[in-house]
Amino acid sequence: YLSPKGKSLDQGLAKSLSKEENINIICGHFEGVDQRLLETRNIQEISIGDYILSGGETASYVFLDAIIRLLPGVLGNNLSIQDESFENSLLEYPQFTKPQKWEEKSVPDVLLSGDHNKIKHWRLSQSEAITRRQRPDLWKKYKIKK
């Protein structure tokens, strides 16, 4: 049941739920669902954030997308998940596309170098800097794991 009273949906919970064989979603509307249902059934309450929506349908889209994309074969390359935000308590590094120069801003030279080791180190340092600056809570978790 998607509820602001529930456990917060994060990447770890999404991973855990992606391994379940079946998931049923109860979408409340305005005030929620009858409390007796929650008390008499084995229902896990899950929150997608600290805000209120008119109904659980919108929240269910977020919930489902977070889980479904982790299923084998849904993404073209399952290894791509490893570098995404939250996988190692870090936010993802900046992304760049073509053209190489756009509005006087260029793609960093290291990304054009072809040196996979340098690119890997650049991505890690960027992820660390972004996380440290924008999400001190994640940075703290990362430093503990490291």
Regions found by a protein language model. Name each.
Residues 2-5, 27-30, 49, 56, ...:
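Fold-independent oxyanion-binding glycine-rich loops
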Residues 1-29:
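S-adenosyl-L-methionine/SAH cofactor-binding core of RNA-modifying enzymes
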Residues 58, 70-109:
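Internal, active-site/partner-interface "lid" segment
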Residues 24, 45, 51-52, 100, ...:
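Short glycine- and Lys/Arg-enriched binding-loop motifs that mark or flank ligand-binding interfaces
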Residues 99-146:
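SAM-dependent methyltransferases
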Residues 33, 37-84:
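Structured adenosyl-cofactor binding patch, chiefly the S-adenosyl-L-methionine
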